[in-house]
Curated annotation (Swiss-Prot):
Membrane topology listed for this record: Multi-pass membrane protein
Transmembrane regions: 7-27
Domain of life: Bacteria
Residue ranges, annotated region (Disordered): 64-86
Official protein name in the record: Sulfate transporter CysZ
Source species of the chain: Mannheimia haemolytica
Cellular component GO terms, alphabetical: plasma membrane
GO molecular function, a single term: high-affinity sulfate:proton symporter activity
C-alpha cells in the first residue's frame, strides 16, 4: 500500500502543473492513510519511555483554583547540593 502510494505520487510529480498540486494532496493523503491504517497499531503496541501514553486529548472542564503561595526564597541547602526533604 505504501509503495503504491509513493509510486503514484512520484508519477504525478513528473506531469507539469499537476506537480504543483500533487504535494499538498499527497501530504493530506499520507496523513489520512496513517490515521486509517497505522494509528491503532502504534497506540496499542508501544514500547519505550512513553509506552501506553494516551495521545488522545480531551477537554477537561475544571474550575479548581490553587491557593498555594510561594515565597521565592532559595534554600541554602540547594547550593550545597543537598536537596533532600527535611
Amino acid at each position: 500500500l505504501n509503495f503504491t502510494f509513493g509510486a503514484l505520487v512520484s508519477l504525478f510529480t513528473m506531469i507539469p502543473f499537476v506537480n504543483l498540486v500533487v504535494m499538498p494532496v499527497a501530504v493530506c493523503g499520507a496523513t489520512a492513510l496513517w490515521v486509517k491504517e497505522y494509528r491503532n497499531f502504534f497506540l496499542n503496541n508501544q514500547t519505550g519511555e512513553f509506552s501506553k501514553a494516551d495521545y488522545t486529548f480531551t477537554k477537561v472542564n475544571s474550575t479548581s483554583l490553587s491557593t498555594e503561595t510561594r515565597t521565592g526564597e532559595v534554600s541554602p541547602n540547594v547550593r550545597n547540593g543537598d536537596i533532600r526533604k527535611q
